[in-house]
């Protein structure tokens, strides 16, 4: 039998998982002066790039922690707060100035950090089965028949694939709200060359000016076509192009990113495509884009969304996040359109950005949206602080109807949380030597809409890496390790970022009411 033995194995090469094993390897070496045996295995082709959806999925526009002006001033913070130290290092080594991450630089930075930490890599892995001793995982058997033994395991996949193989029960889609088929859309990112920021600004402005000018009959025909001949929708789209002061909602270009603020470019594409600009009806949309500005007149677009059910999201994740034929067909139309506007090339990513694919159950301490609004874990336990809105891009299908049916007629928009991070929602109680560090961790209610963000999960991953070493050196399981133990290491090594969680108890109570009310029937069916 081909048997390989390690201390820690991570399945999945999403950035939080990669930084978790680097964190673990460094901590083990600090404590023992020896290199640990750590293995990072992935379904993906690591030769194509290391870093999951940020690299092979081409998601160059990073979602950063968003700290309010008030907190920035009172606590002397920068706009992105105080990121986890290992994330800061990764961004610095990848040459990120604010938002834009060059995939080739990211993979080079991660590879160098992995080599330096002595982490082994394994590509294109399929799990055949899992061996367990009692509740604990003892080894992973791959489809090639090799047995990989370890003491502690980390699952960094969007769908909790290792956890599922180990018998962990997963809530599909938004089953936490009794909506097991509903899922967030997936994105096929693409990169354009030859379309300058200046040219894109001009196009955006021209489209805005024309679509909002009712006397421009040709432009109004295009607008009506994009609205699927629905005059009411055409009017709504027109109104979305103007702000409250009556000014055109032109795109915003920062140093290394562009935020498209109106549907003008989307209208232009959808009229060209002959498809109604209505995501709930068609399931495909060129949305208002988040665009990263890369060197050599390259732009990386997070804009093309595809609706998926929870079972489709799961199937895509299991299939290595590869785009479907239908998605490839759509990108060919996007390519034709963008080339007509001046792009010299349009290159789609080799993998999809899957935002969410369910959540595991049976963690040590589940994390809800209400807990985030209340400020997260106590400051004395905190490993970092994160601030981000409850972002369900593309919407959760059926949530409005579900809320009304349960008697909730208040707003579904909740305040942005600024909360302290721990690791206990990522540690499995049911499989005590396993942690799930991804959008699939033990989130309940609205928590996954914030908890799916990479920067947040890196803080969790750094903590889990340290926890895994604590567990190994003290002959314990991951599930036994407290936030305080991990925090102690961060303090000792000068790695603890600023902690500034905000307890918003009023909004926290409101969201707790909503989460409890909407999830009541979901919990009853478990």
State what each model feature region is.
Residues 2-16:
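Beta1/beta-strand and adjacent pyrophosphate-binding region of the FAD-binding site
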Residues 7-9, 39, 435:
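Conserved beta-strand elements of the Class I
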Residues 14-15, 100-105, 455, 480:
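Soluble non-cytosolic domains of exported or imported proteins
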Residues 15-21, 51, 114, 126-128, ...:
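Mobile, glycine-rich extracellular loop/lid and propeptide segments
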Residues 20-36, 152:
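A short, Lys/Arg-enriched amphipathic alpha-helix followed by its capping loop at the start of a domain
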Residues 29-129, 180, 184-186:
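Conserved N-terminal/central alpha/beta ligand/cofactor-binding core
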Residues 53, 146, 150, 157-463, ...:
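Flavin (FAD/FMN)-binding glycine-rich loop and adjacent Rossmann-like elements that form
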Residues 131-147:
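Conserved beta-strand-loop-beta-strand element in the redox core of flavoprotein oxidoreductases
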């Amino acid at each position: 039998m081909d048997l390989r033995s390690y201390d820690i194995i991570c399945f999945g090469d999403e950035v939080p998982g990669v930084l978790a094993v680097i964190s673990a390897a460094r901590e083990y070496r600090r404590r023992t002066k020896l290199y640990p045996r750590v293995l990072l295995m992935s379904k993906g082709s690591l030769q194509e790039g290391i870093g999951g959806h940020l690299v092979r999925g081409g998601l160059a526009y990073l979602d950063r922690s968003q700290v309010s002006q008030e907190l920035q001033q009172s606590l002397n913070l920068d706009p992105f707060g105080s990121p986890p130290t290992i994330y800061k290092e990764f961004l610095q080594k990848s040459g990120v100035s604010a938002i834009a991450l060059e995939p080739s630089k990211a993979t080079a930075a991660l590879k160098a950090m992995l080599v330096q930490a002595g982490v082994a890599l394994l590509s294109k892995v399929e799990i055949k089965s899992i061996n367990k001793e009692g509740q604990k995982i003892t080894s992973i058997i791959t489809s090639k028949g090799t047995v990989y033994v370890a003491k502690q395991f980390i699952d960094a996949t969007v769908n909790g694939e290792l956890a599922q193989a180990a018998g962990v029960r997963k809530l599909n889609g938004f089953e936490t709200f009794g909506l097991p088929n509903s899922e967030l859309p997936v994105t096929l990112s693409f990169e354009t060359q030859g379309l300058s920021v200046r040219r894109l600004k001009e196009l955006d402005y021209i489209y805005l000016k024309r679509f909002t000018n009712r006397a421009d009959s040709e432009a109004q025909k295009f607008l009506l076509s994009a609205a699927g001949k629905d005059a009411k929708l055409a009017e709504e789209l027109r109104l979305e192009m103007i702000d409250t002061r009556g000014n055109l909602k032109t795109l915003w270009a920062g140093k290394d990113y562009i935020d498209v603020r109106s549907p003008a470019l989307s209208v232009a594409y959808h009229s060209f495509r002959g498809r109604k600009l209505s995501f709930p009806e068609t399931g495909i949309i060129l949305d208002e884009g988040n665009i990263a500005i890369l060197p050599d007149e390259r732009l990386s677009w997070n804009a093309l969304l595809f609706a998926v059910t929870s079972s489709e999201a799961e199937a895509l994740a299991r299939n290595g996040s590869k785009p479907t034929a239908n998605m490839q067909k759509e990108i060919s139309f996007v390519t034709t359109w963008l080339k007509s506007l001046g792009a010299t090339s349009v290159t789609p990513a080799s993998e999809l950005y899957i935002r969410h694919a369910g959540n595991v159950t049976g963690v040590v301490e589940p994390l809800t949206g209400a807990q985030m609004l209340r400020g997260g874990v106590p400051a004395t336990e905190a490993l970092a602080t994160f601030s981000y809105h409850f972002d369900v891009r593309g919407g959760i299908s059926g949530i409005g109807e579900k809320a009304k049916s349960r008697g909730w007629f208040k707003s579904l928009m909740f305040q942005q949380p600024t909360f302290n991070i721990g690791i206990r929602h990522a540690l499995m109680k049911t499989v005590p030597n396993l942690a799930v560090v991804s959008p699939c961790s033990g989130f309940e209610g609205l928590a996954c809409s914030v908890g799916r963000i990479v920067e947040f999960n890196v803080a969790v991953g750094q903590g889990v890496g340290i926890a895994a070493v604590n567990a190994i050196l003290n002959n314990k399981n991951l599930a036994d390790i407290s936030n305080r133990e991990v925090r102690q290491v961060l303090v000792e090594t000068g790695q603890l970022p600023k902690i500034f969680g905000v307890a918003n108890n009023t909004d926290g109570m409101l969201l707790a009411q909503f989460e409890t009310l909407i999830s009541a029937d979901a919990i009853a069916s478990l």
